[in-house]
Amino acid sequence: MPVLHNRISNEELKARMLAETEPRTTVSFYKYFTIDDPKAFRDRLYIQLEQCKVLGRIYIATEGINAQISVPNNQFDAFKAVLFSAHPALDQIRLNIALEDDGKSFWVLRMKVRERIVADGIDDPTFNPANVGQYLKADQVNAMADDPDTVFVDMRNHYEYEVGHFENALEVPSDTFREQLPMAVEMLDEARDKNIVMYCTGGIRCEKASAYMLHHGFKNVYHVEGGIIEYARQAKAQGLPLKFIGKNFVFDERMGERISDDVIAHCHQCGASCDSHTNCRNEGCHLLFIQCPTCAAKYEGCCSTQCLDEMKLPLEEQRAIRSGRENGMKIFNKSKGLLQSTLHIPAPEVKDKAE
């Protein structure tokens, strides 16, 4: 029986990926549909995708599939054939192709079965995730962006919104999607007579959010088809003005795709104009934060002098310091509270309600 998971170290896998000469394409896709046996579906698809040399992260649940992957260009047609034939619901599924891509976004294939493909915290048997808002293409998005009776709602996390968003979009300030959903209902309560446009990176969160808003009695609910990635692709292909400003945060090694030339964020250490995310180099921290080149050199990639000092200690001393706090300091830590307390960044002023 084939091995259905990776057994090679991350270091070796990353070295192999960097040594590849065949160009790769970074792709994301999702689909809400019923999978009766997620584990069997996962195992079957894993074998086929591994043969196509696919790398990346795929979540599978009874409610569907969510994937961010990279595919060798010479295997792309084979990959599409595998995916489109994996289930009738996946035939001709839309693939979001990365806008900025060197093909080095992933170095291992990880496929996991989860309870949900996006953690929403919804525990209401009357909720119908199939009853979603209306899709909007790029030209429709632009028209609604200029409409004073329309509210754009960003259904991404604080660190995503910080580096890029649609003009005048409402931020729902939270670390998690499950917290955002009820917050969005409360914040938009006085805007029930307006058009509500939900958006996210690739469409998976805003599609479910649109269903959640309809479930809570909102009538004119829309969501951006394919999220920011597809909007930017359509807008650029059609020569439309970009209503999204800044950078689109992505969950791979790139950490962002440039959408417009605007840099709307600032270095979390010195305040210089910057929108480049990084993880603190201290193995006991890995805080996600924005760091300019000057501060990267000054702090050697760390988020603070404390982490810099700790990183220079002998390994045994580092491990002793980290002991007992590992569970709270996982790699790719994205907590807004931790960011504010570590770097002494004040919480931004956020509107309580949509105007």
UniProtKB/Swiss-Prot annotation:
Residues 146-240 form the Rhodanese domain. Pfam families: Rhodanese, Rhodanese_C, UPF0176_N. It is an enzyme of class 1 (oxidoreductase). Its EC number is 1.14.-.-. The active site is at residue 200. InterPro entries: Rhodanese-like_dom (IPR001763), Rhodanese-like_dom_sf (IPR036873), Rhodanese_C (IPR022111), TrhO (IPR020936), TRHO_N (IPR040503). SMART domains: RHOD. Keywords: Oxidoreductase, tRNA processing. GO terms for biological process: tRNA modification. The keyword Magnesium does not apply. The keyword tRNA processing applies. Belongs to the TrhO family. HAMAP family: TrhO. Catalyzes oxygen-dependent 5-hydroxyuridine (ho5U) modification at position 34 in tRNAs. This is tRNA uridine(34) hydroxylase. It comes from Pectobacterium carotovorum subsp. carotovorum (strain PC1). The lineage of its organism: Bacteria, Pseudomonadati, Pseudomonadota, Gammaproteobacteria, Enterobacterales. The gene is trhO.
